[in-house]
Amino acid sequence: TTEKASEDAASGKADTKTADSTALAGKKISVMTPYLTSVTTNQMAGFIKNNLEAEGAEVFVIDTANDFAELASRIEDVVSSGTDGIVLVSADPNQVANQLTEAFDADIPVFGCDSGFIDGMQVNATSDNYQMGELIVRYLFDDLMGGKGTVIALTHRPHPGVVKRCEAFDDIIKEYPDIQLITEQHVPAEQPINDAEEITANLLTANPDKDSVTAIFAAWDEPAIGAAKALAEAGRDKVIVTGVDGNEQAVQMIKDGSCLKATVKQNFEGMADIVCRQMEKYYAGETIEKGEMYAPAELITQENAQ
């Protein structure tokens, strides 16, 4: 099950012997992402590479450095060179749908890890991003803000997971007439910590009154870290920041009592493990259930940060 896969991954057990362990031997697998600079994307790509190589596969990790046009072009390349499988990591398949259709037409299986899912793909392993958004937003609005105040949203809507978290934010804020959204700002994916720090510093200058900003909702941890740095620099340490991902630096900042008060920890190894297991089944000729598979996530606050 998804939960079992996630638990095993969380405890560091990559039990990759559940399917025919020779099924992947000699297969050429293309692990493709535009976001290898992201700590968590890198972690997932590395986990998949190591596990599939342990099964005898030849794994190529291809990073296009935030360039979706280049990603599209590289997908065409691996399809024409006859790859045996594609794993799309942290990338919206809708943005490369035409190229993926070429893979489907060539009977090349496509798996997603922290991506979206489109018809033709086998599986996308992810978190339930809407539910994660709901978890963090309700904690922010109810527990941290007490149902009132102002909030800034730092987002990156090209990422399918971030979009779902933002949709949860958009839906829930309607239920809180005493919470006003000051602005939503797009944070580029290349240097999200630095960019969010700069964006936040500018917003603090534009809202100089100490009480003018109550909270900052960051749709993932890097901008939350950047925002917390800007707040510390400006001496605005009463402003509350939340993130999503549970990356190491963010969890440490929560423990240290910074402005960053909470995040939702995604089980990235759990996602990567689900993908590896499903690939083993696929290449062993077993039927797999197509669609999204979820690795469970948890709310991290100062009480449980480790």
Question: What feature does the model see in each segment?
Answer:
Residues 1-28, 54, 58, 101-108, ...:
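Short, low-complexity disordered leader/linker segments with a strong preference
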Residues 7, 12-25, 161, 172-175, ...:
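Hinge/cleft segment of the Venus flytrap/periplasmic-binding protein
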Residues 23, 71, 125-151, 163-164, ...:
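Hydrophobic alpha-helical segments within soluble ligand-binding/sensing domains
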Residues 26-52, 59-73, 77, 81, ...:
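Extracytoplasmic "Venus flytrap"
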Residues 40-55, 132-136, 161-180, 195-199, ...:
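Short, solvent-exposed amphipathic alpha-helices that sit
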Residues 53-64, 150-153, 175-193:
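Short beta-strand elements in bilobed, periplasmic/extracellular small-molecule ligand-binding domains
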Residues 76-80, 85-105, 169, 189-252:
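Hydrophobic alpha-helical
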Residues 93-131, 135, 150, 247-256, ...:
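Flexible loop/hinge segments that line or gate small-molecule binding clefts
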